[in-house]
């Protein structure tokens, strides 16, 4: 018995090797799991649930096949796919989670999240996040023609790339005090997140001498990153080569 966690695949038609590796994962590994958690940034950018492209349908089909075969799939929105909505959930059978969710892993409580909200030193990003998460703005964006939304997103992505070049690695990493604050808020000793693209398993000793664990999922740019949480043996963070597409 085991549960799987992935994040930060940044799926895009531009990266067929990542897409092929994801499809293989869904069909050969996820299908055998008790549940699958996707902790944000599945897509390089999700423009909206009205995406008519073959690529979008291909990805939705993989989730639909998985959930129809009885494997629960839970989805946390990331900073690249925060526009995933109810229509996507209905079409795929996935269950959308709030920004922070407490789950039960075979008797172990854990808080799962994408991880961007832990980076409290990145104030410019958090200001941007607050703006684009406003419901009225998302509704307005959703009313735009798909082609216009694509154009706007390309501009946003370009601005984000330029902004990243001027940020230090420390600013883009999590703030330790925020990690502890979130774990205390939910009274958990285990946190699982993505976003930073720095896969690792961290042990944290708090002021009250409690030992806590923070597991960070990696991206799929050059290899896969999968957290396997087994009922019998606990957790292991795995990576595998991507499928080579000639």
UniProtKB/Swiss-Prot annotation:
Membrane topology: Peripheral membrane protein
UniProtKB keywords: Cell inner membrane, Cell membrane, Hydrolase, Lipid A biosynthesis, Lipid biosynthesis, Lipid metabolism, Manganese, Membrane, Metal-binding
Co-factor binding details: Binds 2 Mn(2+) ions per subunit in a binuclear metal center.
Main localization of the protein described in the UniProt heading: membrane
Gene Ontology terms for molecular function: manganese ion binding; UDP-2,3-diacylglucosamine hydrolase activity
GO cellular component: a single term: cytoplasm
Family the entry assigns: Belongs to the LpxH family.
PANTHER family in alphabetical order: UDP-2,3-DIACYLGLUCOSAMINE HYDROLASE, UDP-2,3-DIACYLGLUCOSAMINE HYDROLASE-RELATED
Protein task: Hydrolyzes the pyrophosphate bond of UDP-2,3-diacylglucosamine to yield 2,3-diacylglucosamine 1-phosphate (lipid X) and UMP by catalyzing the attack of water at the alpha-P atom. Involved in the biosynthesis of lipid A, a phosphorylated glycolipid that anchors the lipopolysaccharide to the outer membrane of the cell.
Descriptive protein name: UDP-2,3-diacylglucosamine hydrolase
Native source species: Vibrio cholerae serotype O1 (strain ATCC 39541 / Classical Ogawa 395 / O395)
